[in-house]
Amino acid sequence: MKVTDIKTFTVDCFRTNWVFVKVYTDEGITGVGEATLEYKEKALIGAVEHIREYLTGKNPLQIEKHFHDIYRDAYWRGGAVLMSALSAVEMALWDILGK
């Protein structure tokens, strides 16, 4: 199984825009994660796009490896934007594993 795409979806709500992430695989299994970060939706979506470039074509079941590779590759480690994006993608990968 390989990751084929990662898409973001923004749901506009009062005072907070919710950001959801959906990871797609070549076997038709998808996973969903949530990455809301108040007033930083565009930065968050940009961070998810960078993660998409890394994960496309990779095995979605190697969750911990991908988490550490992405975290260590980031210049600003531990920041709110990166950690929210990474958390959402990680949730989606665990969702895929569970399915």
What are these language model-derived features?
Residues M1-V32, T36-L37:
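Structured beta-strand/loop patches that form or line metal/cofactor-binding pockets in enzymes
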